[in-house]
A protein has these predicted regions:
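Short boundary motifs at domain starts and secondary-structure transition points
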Residues: 134-139, 328
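Short Lys/Arg-enriched helix C-cap and helix-to-coil transition segments
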Residues: 121-134
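Conserved beta-strand elements of the Class I
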Residues: 144-146
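Single, function-defining residue in the core of a domain
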Residues: 8-89, 97-98, 105, 110-118, ...
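Extracytosolic and intramembrane catalytic regions of membrane-associated proteins
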Residues: 166
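Extreme N-terminal basic, low-complexity initiation segments
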Residues: 2-5
Length: 456
């Protein structure tokens, strides 16, 4: 292969083209087509995805044709599962746990050198590949229930990276900060997409629109909190053919403040709002009807109107359809929701229940950081941290899918049970490493069950 061909292959591993690489590399790891989801098939899907990457490892090597070409103590096909299996101990302990008490095993410095030859996009590719292969497309009234949110991850201090560096104040140590934007399936309890940004350059709205635009999911309801309130976000979701349900501000700085709404604690008002960035005299007259027309200034990002226009260019409008719903949550507080769900199919009580389901992504972040051990990184370099972030996302999905396949109901049907996720992670990690056969895995998971109590 020519040097130009190698360079072209590496360009394919950029985030914007990663989906193409994933589809090309591993089409055979699909669980769709009637196969029953169980621990064995989940494990096979992940192993197949790793093998597919190994078959095309030059795509994910920092120097194609030079890196990962010889069979060393840390070959490519071992480094990938090794990083996936990280527990949170020291690197030396991780090596002993994975490779056994073998005096001939590689050292921690040899591993660091080897992982530097693997692009961070390798683990991003693995995450997307595996997630697609186990996607059962579970629907809620015809829709995928997806939540979007972000979470910060503190990493080792590096003053040379001003986009993520925070100097210590009041005696605190300096640190760098990454922001993980994630899209989470609330029915399958798995991450379906993620995008990592440096904290000082973080833009949650840009991350949301990127994940929405590149998704292959046909029909979905996207749930989000107040940080995602913007006309541009709503427009991207609407143009995707999806539905949205987003909590918005009640004060003077949000979408609701620019509309004439009832002065009551509970209402459900539909809107057909035409957006424009034109400000001719004729348009100014239309804008007086603020429940039907809205001016978008050129300082606000909106991707569906021309960036600039000349004085005599005709006005361009973008029509956005939504409802604003308000309801009390206590004697002194109300929630305000913007959604484009049909009012007859999803009345007020459904809106309340759906928004409460968004909490699932918050719980997932806690499990990702504490139970899976994302807070216990084995790296200082951002490139290595990115490897571990997507490795943890992959293993989170792996563990969730296996525990979901072992849901138990008592004979008297008093409660439905689920597996304790903290214990399950330890068991599933052993299963991934090949130390536990499926029957033993399921028997062990059944020992650590908790009742599912509705409403909690």
């Amino acid at each position: 292969m020519t040097k130009a061909s190698f360079r072209a292959a590496i360009l394919l591993t950029s985030v914007s083209k990663m989906a193409f690489v994933v589809r090309s590399v591993s089409r055979h790891a699909k669980l769709r087509g009637g196969l029953l989801m169980n621990p064995k098939t989940v494990k096979k899907a992940l192993k197949d995805a790793i093998q597919a990457m190994t078959d095309y490892k030059w795509l994910f090597s920092a120097r194609p044709g030079k890196d990962n070409t010889r069979n060393r103590k840390f070959p490519f096909q071992k480094v990938i599962p090794f990083i996936l299996a990280f527990r949170g101990g020291t690197l030396n302990h991780e090596i002993m746990d994975f490779f056994g008490l073998d005096p001939s095993a590689g050292t921690s410095s040899a591993f660091i050198q080897r992982r530097s030859t693997i692009l961070p996009e390798a683990f991003e590719s693995l995450f997307h590949d595996f997630s697609r292969s186990v996607d059962e497309n579970k629907l809620y009234r015809g829709l995928r229930l997806l939540a979007v949110d972000g979470s910060d991850l503190q990493i080792a201090a590096n003053p040379k990276d001003p986009d993520s560096y925070y100097p210590g104040v009041n005696g605190q140590r300096a640190y760098n900060l990454l922001h993980i934007n994630a899209m989470y399936d609330l029915h399958q309890h798995i991450y379906v997409d993620a995008l990592v940004q440096k904290s000082r350059k973080a833009d949650e709205s840009a991350a949301l629109t990127a994940m929405v635009d590149r998704s292959a999911i046909e029909s979905a309801l996207l749930l989000a909190d107040r940080g995602y309130e913007s006309y541009n976000n709503l427009a991207h979701i609407q143009e995707k053919g999806w539905n949205f349900l987003i909590r918005i501000k009640d004060g003077t700085a949000g979408i609701a403040s620019g509309l004439a709404l009832p002065a009551t604690d509970e209402f459900d008002v539909p809107f057909h709002l035409k957006l424009t960035n034109k400000q001719s005299n004729e348009i100014k007259e239309l804008l007086k009807d603020k429940n039907h027309y809205k001016h978008i200034t050129n300082t606000i990002r909106f991707d569906y109107l021309p960036r600039t226009s000349r004085k005599y260019d005709p006005a361009v409008f973008f029509e956005l359809h939504f409802r604003i719903v308000r309801f009390p949550i206590s004697d002194t507080a109300c929630e305000t929701i913007i959604t484009n769900l049909d009012a007859s199919a999803f009345p007020l009580h459904d809106i309340k229940r759906l928004y409460a389901m968004r909490w699932g992504i918050e719980t997932s972040f806690r499990n990702l950081k504490h139970t899976l051990g994302l807070l216990h990184l084995h790296a200082k370099k951002v490139e290595f941290v990115l490897q571990e972030i997507f490795a943890k996302l992959t293993m989170y999905n792996f563990c969730e899918l296996i525990t979901q396949s072992v849901v138990i109901r008592q004979a008297q049907k008093t409660h439905t049970y689920k597996v304790n996720f903290s214990d399950a992670v330890h068991i599933c990690r052993q299963f991934f490493l090949g130390d536990v056969p499926p029957p033993i895995l399921e028997a062990m998971l059944m020992r650590y069950i908790l009742p599912i109590r509705p409403g909690r």
